[in-house]
C-alpha cells in the first residue's frame, strides 16, 4: 500500500530554503501523493508559496499526529548524509532532492520565496532611509557572521570558522561605505562609529528573516559568509559575493551561478 508522505525538515532557515526545490519536484513527479511538510524549525519560508503554504505544519500543530501523521509514511531527509553532498558533488538543494526524490544529481530551479506587499513596503522603507541618510544611490546587505557566532566580554568569536573576523568587518565597512549605503545583517551589532567609520550604517534590529529577504530583494548586492543571506540572495536573483571559510563552496554555495562571486579562503 502506498501512503502519503510527511517530510520532516529540520535545521536553520538556510536548510528550509534549500529544501523548497526538492519538495516542488516531489509534487511534480508524484501528483497523487498528498504529502505534507512538518517543520521542526520554522515554517516562515514556506509561507505564501503557491504549493507548500497549505502543506506546511509546525511540529507542535494541534492534533497533527492523530489527524495526519499516523496514516502517513514519515520521512526525515538529511542532506548532509547524502554521498554526493559530502563528496562535494552536490549543493544543499541538490542533496535534498536526492534524499527526497532519489533521482540522482540534477539541475534544479531556484527556491521560490513569495513576499507579501507589506514585507516589500517595509523593506523599501529601510532601503530608502539608508540611501537618504548616506546620500548613496546603491545599497548592499552585509552579513558577516554565521549562526555559530557569539559575543563574550566584548569579543566576537565563531569557532566554526564560518564568520568574518571583526577587524575585517570594520575594514570592509570603511571601504564599502564610500560607494554603498550599507545595511548590516546580524544579531550582533557593531558600533562602527567607534571604529573610525564616518558614514552611517543601517543596523535593523528585531526584524524576521522574511523582512530580511525583502530587504535583500531590493538591494544592489549582497556580501556575506556561509549563512542564510546568500541562499536568500540566490533565490531572489540578487548578485552576491560570498566568502567561504571552513566549509566547501560546492556544498554550501553556488559556484556555477554567474551572478555569484565566491572567495574560498
Indicate where each model-derived feature is located.
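Structural motif
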Residues: 4-6, 139, 181, 221
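Short, well-ordered beta-to-alpha junction loops that form the rim of enzyme active sites
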Residues: 41, 143-146, 185-188
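Mid-sequence helix-capping/hinge segment at a functional interface
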Residues: 82-166
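Active-site and donor-binding regions of nucleotide-sugar-utilizing enzymes
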Residues: 1-93, 211-214, 229-231
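Donor-binding and catalytic core of enzymes assembling or modifying cell-surface/extracellular glycoconjugates
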Residues: 17, 153-251, 257-260
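Active-site anion-handling motifs in enzyme catalytic cores
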Residues: 72-82, 89, 93-95, 137-140, ...
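Short acidic-hydrophobic, aromatic-tinged amphipathic segments that line or gate anion-handling sites
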Residues: 53-59, 202-205, 260-265
Amino acid at each position: 500500500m502506498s501512503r502519503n508522505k510527511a517530510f520532516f525538515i529540520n535545521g536553520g532557515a538556510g536548510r528550509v530554503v534549500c529544501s523548497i526545490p526538492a519538495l516542488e519536484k516531489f509534487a511534480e513527479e508524484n501528483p497523487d501523493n498528498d504529502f505534507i511538510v512538518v517543520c521542526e524549525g520554522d515554517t516562515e519560508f514556506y509561507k505564501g508559496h503557491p504549493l507548500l503554504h497549505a502543506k506546511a505544519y509546525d511540529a507542535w500543530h494541534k492534533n497533527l499526529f492523530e489527524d495526519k501523521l499516523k496514516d502517513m509514511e514519515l520521512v526525515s531527509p538529511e542532506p548532509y548524509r547524502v554521498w554526493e553532498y559530502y563528496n562535494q558533488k552536490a549543493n544543499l538543494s541538490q542533496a535534498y532532492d536526492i534524499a527526497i526524490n532519489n533521482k540522482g544529481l540534477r539541475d534544479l530551479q531556484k527556491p521560490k520565496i513569495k513576499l507579501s506587499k507589506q514585507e516589500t513596503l517595509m523593506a523599501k522603507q529601510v532601503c530608502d532611509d539608508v540611501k537618504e541618510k548616506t546620500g548613496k544611490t546603491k545599497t548592499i546587505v552585509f552579513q558577516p557572521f554565521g549562526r555559530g557566532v557569539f559575543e563574550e566580554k566584548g569579543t566576537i568569536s565563531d569557532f566554526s570558522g564560518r564568520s568574518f573576523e571583526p577587524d575585517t568587518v570594520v575594514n570592509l565597512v570603511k571601504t564599502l561605505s564610500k560607494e554603498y549605503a550599507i545595511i548590516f545583517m546580524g544579531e550582533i551589532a557593531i558600533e562602527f562609529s567607534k571604529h573610525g567609520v564616518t558614514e552611517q550604517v543601517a543596523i535593523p534590529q528585531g526584524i524576521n528573516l522574511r523582512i530580511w529577504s525583502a530587504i535583500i530583494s531590493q538591494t544592489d548586492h549582497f556580501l556575506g559568509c556561509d549563512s542564510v543571506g546568500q541562499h536568500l540572495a540566490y533565490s531572489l536573483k540578487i548578485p552576491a559575493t560570498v566568502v567561504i571559510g571552513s566549509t566547501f563552496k560546492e556544498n554550501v554555495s553556488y559556484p556555477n551561478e554567474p551572478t555569484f562571486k565566491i572567495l574560498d579562503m
